[in-house]
């Protein structure tokens, strides 16, 4: 099982090109199920999760090829509208095939999902929405069975804001009979990116980027070409690493607007930040100031940046309170950061971080995707060597992280 060995050293300096967003690429790949035509997707990150999704689509009968960062999808021969447990258990986003399959083929059989172990993250909102659109759904032997002769437009009000739920219902609504209104819709840039692709494919969607999406169903969608939006979480992770290491880092191919809440907190921590249309530069001349925050839905502070900012706060001056409102059980990195010398206490959904001048290298274990990233940041600024075990979590969401960090001065390598 691969590990990272990191030798803490000086500041990160240089340039990094930001990859396409995993959380946009996965639903966008699923959108290929909605048409028999060819859909070409550029800027797809080379990740374990994207490879798993392509494998799942191929297993259903889709022609799905990946050349470099371009995926080519053709859904003429889909013959098995099923997502088996063997693939779904490793990736929660597999649930995103449910809406497209029911909408185009009238049936789907999808195993209940797995992925990172950070709380319940139930799929009941997906099911509730599809039932409102006329699908008959049952759950038997760990599988969601859905059937509908044709989905009907409906007004769907989810009980909570759910990104994958919004994406699933949005894709389903594109081929439904009549108008569907999705209230309390997620507004994340990745949802907007999916909606923009669907429009290119012939979908009729109003309210893109808002919490109220109005979809006029069409009889069929056609092929399109699309480029995946930049990964704001990858970008934020590298910015936190640069801030913690007192570095000077330029990120390319990232529109700063989608990272607004993170940039505000980095400035509050003392970072000097410059931006252009598609680049961000962060420089840090002194030890960061501790910053408190509360995670919430976009455009507020993202839960997927909570762990990275905890690592930054661990070496900052002062004390910060971090409140996690999106997922339960998302402080599993606290214990591992404390092994590196951090001073963090967690109770319920709030963690209190008192910064220390230095961390010290140790052997630690990654528990989920973003927790892994926080340990990398901590290792980069710790005295001595840090070894991070179970980095397969990291490979699910970061494209060649060690290569990108090495190019800007980090001493990090993958070991068996």
Curated annotation (Swiss-Prot):
First-level EC class: transferase
2-(S-cysteinyl)pyruvic acid O-phosphothioketal modifications at: 116
CDD domains membership: UdpNAET
Reaction catalysis annotation: phosphoenolpyruvate + UDP-N-acetyl-alpha-D-glucosamine = UDP-N-acetyl-3-O-(1-carboxyvinyl)-alpha-D-glucosamine + phosphate
Residue numbers annotated as active site: 116 (proton donor)
Localization annotation: Cytoplasm
Functional pathway: Cell wall biogenesis; peptidoglycan biosynthesis
Annotated GO MF terms: UDP-N-acetylglucosamine 1-carboxyvinyltransferase activity
Binding site for UDP-N-acetyl-alpha-D-glucosamine: 92, 121-125, 304, 326
GO cellular component: cytoplasm
Gene3D superfamilies assigned: Enolpyruvate transferase domain (3.65.10.10)
PANTHER family linked: UDP-N-ACETYLGLUCOSAMINE 1-CARBOXYVINYLTRANSFERASE
Family that this chain belongs to: Belongs to the EPSP synthase family. MurA subfamily.
Protein name: UDP-N-acetylglucosamine 1-carboxyvinyltransferase
Phylogenetic classification of the source organism: Bacteria, Pseudomonadati, Pseudomonadota, Betaproteobacteria, Burkholderiales
Gene that this sequence comes from: murA
């Amino acid at each position: 099982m691969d590990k990272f060995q990191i030798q803490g050293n000086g500041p990160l300096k240089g340039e990094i090109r930001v990859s396409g967003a995993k959380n946009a690429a996965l639903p966008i790949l699923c959108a290929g199920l909605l048409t028999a035509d060819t859909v070409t997707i550029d800027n797809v990150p080379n990740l374990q999760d994207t490879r798993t999704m392509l494998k799942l689509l191929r297993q259903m009968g889709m022609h799905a090829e990946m050349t470099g960062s371009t995926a080519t999808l053709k859904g003429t021969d889909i013959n098995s509208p099923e997502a088996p447990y063997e693939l779904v258990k490793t990736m929660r986003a597999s649930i995103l095939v449910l809406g497209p399959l029911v909408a185009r083929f009238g049936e789907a059989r999808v195993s209940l999902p797995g992925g990172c172990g950070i709380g319940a993250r139930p799929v009941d909102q997906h099911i509730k929405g599809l039932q409102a659109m006329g699908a008959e759904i049952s759950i038997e032997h760990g599988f969601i069975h859905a059937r509908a002769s044709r989905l009907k437009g409906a007004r769907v009000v989810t009980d909570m804001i759910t990104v994958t739920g919004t994406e699933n219902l949005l894709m389903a609504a594109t081929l439904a009979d009549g108008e569907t209104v999705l209230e309390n819709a997620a507004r994340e840039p990745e949802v907007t990116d999916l909606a923009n692709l669907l429009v290119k494919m012939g979908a009729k969607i109003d309210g893109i980027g808002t919490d109220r999406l109005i979809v006029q169903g069409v009889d069929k969608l056609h092929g399109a070409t699309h480029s995946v939006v930049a990964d704001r979480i990858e970008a934020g992770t590298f910015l936190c690493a640069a801030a913690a290491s007192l570095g000077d880092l330029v990120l390319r191919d990232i529109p700063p607007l989608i990272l607004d809440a993170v940039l505000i907190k980095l400035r509050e921590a003392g970072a000097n930040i410059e931006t252009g249309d598609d680049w961000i530069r962060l420089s840090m001349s002194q030890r960061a100031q501790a910053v408190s925050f509360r995670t919430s839905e976009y455009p507020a502070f993202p839960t997927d940046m909570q762990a990275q900012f905890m690592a930054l706060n661990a070496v900052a001056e002062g004390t910060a309170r971090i409140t996690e409102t999106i997922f339960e059980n998302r402080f599993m990195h606290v214990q591992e950061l404390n092994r590196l010398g951090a001073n963090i206490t967690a109770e319920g959904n709030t963690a209190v971080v008192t910064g220390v001048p230095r961390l010290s290298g140790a052997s630690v274990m990654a528990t989920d995707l973003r927790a892994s990233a926080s340990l990398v940041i901590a290792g980069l600024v710790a005295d001595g060597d840090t070894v991070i075990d179970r980095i397969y979590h990291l490979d699910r969401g970061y494209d060649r992280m060690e290569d990108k960090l090495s190019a800007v001065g980090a001493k990090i390598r993958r070991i068996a």
